[in-house]
């Protein structure tokens, strides 16, 4: 299944099936979080958090695609990602788009 960030596919005939979403809330464990706190003092990339967010985006995308497949979709257009802090050291990644079926 393809996902597109564009709002529509010019020249392609398709039927809109509806909005699909995927989300996850992730946090780091205490030991990893402590290590990242020390890294934050001296500066630089917080690799454990980068990896956590990459995993969260992947999982959210998989959940959105599963929802689209359940509708019989061929693709998802208008895909957008949103992140928000839920609490200290926890973040939500939400992905959403419009499921379509080619005619």
Task: Name every feature range the model reports, one short phrase each.
Residues 20, 33-78:
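Short, well-ordered alpha-helical segments
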Residues 66, 70-103:
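Surface-exposed short loop/turn segments
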Residues 27, 48-49, 83, 102:
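Basic, gly/Ser/Thr/Pro-rich low-complexity segments located predominantly at protein N termini
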């Amino acid at each position: 299944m393809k996902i597109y960030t564009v709002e529509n596919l010019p020249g392609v005939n398709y039927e809109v099936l509806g909005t699909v979403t995927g989300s996850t809330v992730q946090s780091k464990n205490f030991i990893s979080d402590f290590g990242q706190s020390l890294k934050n003092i001296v500066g630089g990339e917080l690799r454990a958090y980068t990896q956590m967010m990459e995993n969260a985006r992947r999982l959210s995308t998989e959940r959105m695609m599963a929802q689209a497949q359940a509708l019989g979709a061929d693709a998802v257009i208008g895909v957008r990602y949103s992140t928000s802090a839920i609490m200290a050291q926890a973040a939500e990644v939400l992905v959403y788009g419009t499921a379509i079926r080619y005619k």
